Design a protein with these regions (language model features):
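Secretory-pathway-linked proteins and extracytosolic
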Residues: 62-67, 71, 75-196
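Lumenal/extracellular ectodomains and adaptor appendage modules
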Residues: 1-84, 176-178, 186-187, 191-193
């Protein structure tokens, strides 16, 4: 199983003599670094960056890890003028969506056609296309009363809730409150003390 990072583009925008100058990143500034025998990291360096520079970048991830979608933080430590998170998931994978934070995101949720590769075979099916967009988001700042300010930023989290393939029973990966209650009460270290 692998993830492929592709279509990396980056630009630096600077004001020079009253005009906006856009500098495109060249392919030679994209680096791959092998971390170990299983992992490789992709890095890139945006040219002509200095104080006041606006940076724009985009990339695409194609992943075999159907059970995990990376969380997305719309807010950063610096103000974000525009940010977008665009994902498509085959209809058989049921993800629970959790959005939180104080900033408003534009959200699109539509059905599209996708190709799903399983065991080398390509299947055509419907997919759920989700797109989240944020505009003019303020930067996150440290606060004396907040342990981890990033936890309070506007973000999107997706968790695999279940699999629903045709001809198979639905397989759930999430717990209901009743399941959690039962597990806690059955636990000898926790529930046993409540059954006095």
């Amino acid at each position: 199983m692998k993830e492929i990072v592709s279509q990396i583009d980056a630009f630096a925008y600077n004001i020079e003599e009253g005009k906006t100058v856009r500098t495109k990143m060249k392919r030679e500034f994209i680096f791959k670094e092998r971390l170990n025998d299983k992992y490789m990291q992709v890095k890139f360096s945006v040219p002509n960056v200095k104080p006041g520079t606006v940076i724009e970048y985009r990339y695409k991830i194609l992943s075999d890890f159907y059970f995990h979608i990376n969380n997305w933080s719309a807010q950063q430590s610096i103000p974000v003028y525009y940010t977008e998170y665009d994902i498509t998931v085959p209809e058989y994978f049921k993800f629970n969506l959790d959005m939180h934070g104080t900033e408003q995101l534009q959200t699109e949720d539509e059905t599209v056609g996708v190709n799903l590769v399983i065991g080398g075979q390509v299947f055509q099916c419907n997919g759920r296309h989700l797109c989240f967009k944020g505009n003019k988001l303020p930067g996150l700042h440290d606060d004396n009363y907040v342990w981890c300010v990033e936890d309070y930023g506007t973000q999107v989290n997706l968790e695999l809730g279940g699999l629903d393939f045709p001809g198979a029973l639905y397989k759930s990966f999430t717990q209901t409150w009743e399941n959690i209650d039962e597990a806690l009460l059955d636990d000898s270290e926790f529930g046993g003390q409540l059954k006095i």
